[in-house]
Amino acid sequence: MNYINNKRILTHSALVLAMLGSLVGCGSDSDDTTTPSTTKPPQLSPAVGVKMTGSCSDLLGFQYNNTVISSATLQETGTLTVANKPIGAHCLVKGYMDQRVSPVDGQTYQIGFEMRLPVDWNGRFLYQGNGGTDGNLIPATGQVGSGGPLTNALHDGFAVISSDAGHNASQNPMFGLDPQARINYGYGAITKLTPMAKNLIKTAYGKLPDRSYAGGTSNGGRHAMIAATRLGDQYDGILASTLGFHLPRAAAAQLYTAQQLRRVATDENDLSTALTLSERKVLAKAILDRCDALDGVADGLVQDVEACRTAFDIHQHVPVCSSTRDGTCLSTEQIDVLANIYRGPVNSAGQALYATQPFDPGLVGSNWASWKFESSVGTARDPVAVGILFQVPPDPTVVQNSRQFAFNYNFDTDYLKLSATNDVYTESSMSFMMPPDELNLDKLRNHGGKMIVVQGTADGVFSVDDTQNWYDQLLQHYKNDAKGTAPEFARFFRVPGMNHTRDGIATDQFDALTALVNWVEYGQAPDKIIATARGAGNPSGQVNTELPQDWAPDRSRPLCPYPLIARYNGQGDSEKAENFSCK
């Protein structure tokens, strides 16, 4: 990452800012009850780096409430690498907080963590939110939100913390039987670890972090949203990538997907038989035929998501099989099933229970297929999350019958268990997993904080429409607010074709953290973020083998702040971002 004081200045366009501002109308719906003020939030100053004081072993003596430091060791330069580049020398500190024995299941729980503190520190702290059901201590490198990263926060001098969110791998998914473990997974871990981590930083460097960031992908993006809403005055920058901040609803939607796919699967034990790769390619081509050129160039990407909603109709624009399925067409029932999946789950009264999804050719990606065909019925993902972690009361037998649990899930009765409570489980998953008020970002905004949200349009589990709906409401909530409209402190970027967190048919390699730092500390609002395809020879060493052969291996595109999209300028190499503009 190169920040502005290191000679990289992000392009700033007053025109685009004006366009973004005009999109939010007039009047104010802010719930801020303080005395109205025309004073804008302050511009935060850049972080100032310092060297570590003392040695790593000194940190073994760190004292904090209910915290145990179990090890503190020096990691020499090159112990870790990113994109074949050495990460500098740093202290690796491991420990845990709040060890206890559950009165419900008798298990011993604790919030395990590791912190990596650079010897040569840049003055910044990053809370790394991790994905899935947590339970593992993912190395605290600060790799957030992109395919094949070329750098990470630790490489660039951040102090980074990572945690297991209050349970270990052997307790997955049965930690859902313990009410406090549920809460720690939802929001307890980040709220407890944040002040501890800052105090450990002060011990290591003689000062608190100048700037604090929270970032993560998938469930880690949800953790970042929790930081934005519950801890907005403790963080200066939020990077929420592929965020599942309505995770209980999204997980239940996966069960609906499984039920729909079962209708057309030739083998219910292999849901990929419901829609083969050849058949997914038929659908992708139909989408591209109607929507590819809407952004000014036919390039295999659908940038104009909104226009495509009107231009493409799955009931009208997909070849229909006249007899048996042969991979060149879709049956009428397959089309109905896909229409239902992309509409999202409903109950018997027709009430929408999650969000729609846009049709995108990225559905040919194996990442998309894995979430739809495997995770929707598997023992490690959605059924166990719904049945053990999110519903009240939990049902531990789901581990043994996850497929049948998904197939038999009742969206009238079972879905209500996501918001249920009882004497043991006094907080529902709709409370502990989701932000308390997802539209109130006053604490973040009012002290000068900023937020970047990124999501792929072909995500196989968390709908980009769900995130977009939230952002549309945020635009309305802060419209014409004297303290700052939404685009002045929070921006949402869609990644066309990208599957869950990465992959798909997409330019999925980008550096949103640098963009966030330059916005927070230097006032340079991100009018675009350049994204690159990971074709042959990509310097990350992580090649996306599913990219079309007619793409340049280093194809680039600007990711645009919603509602703007990347449009071809009409001339120049269409493989290069420089020939596209956000309009």
Describe each PLM feature range.
Residues I226-A228, D233-S348, R494:
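A catalytic-pocket lid/entrance helix-loop region that shapes and gates access to the active site
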Residues K207-S218:
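Alpha/beta-hydrolase fold nucleophile elbow
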Residues V453-Q455:
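Short beta-strand/loop motif that positions the catalytic acidic residue
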Residues N122, N130-G206, A252-A253, R403-M433, ...:
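Cap/lid segment of the alpha/beta-hydrolase catalytic domain
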Residues G216-G220, A224, D459:
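Gly/Ala-rich beta-loop-alpha elbow adjacent to hydrolase catalytic centers
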Residues G21-G25:
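C-terminal motif of bacterial Sec signal peptides marking the signal peptidase cleavage site
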Residues N2-A14:
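Bacterial N-terminal signal peptides that target proteins for export
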Residues D31-R124, N136-A140, G147-G148, A284, ...:
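Catalytic-loop region of hydrolases
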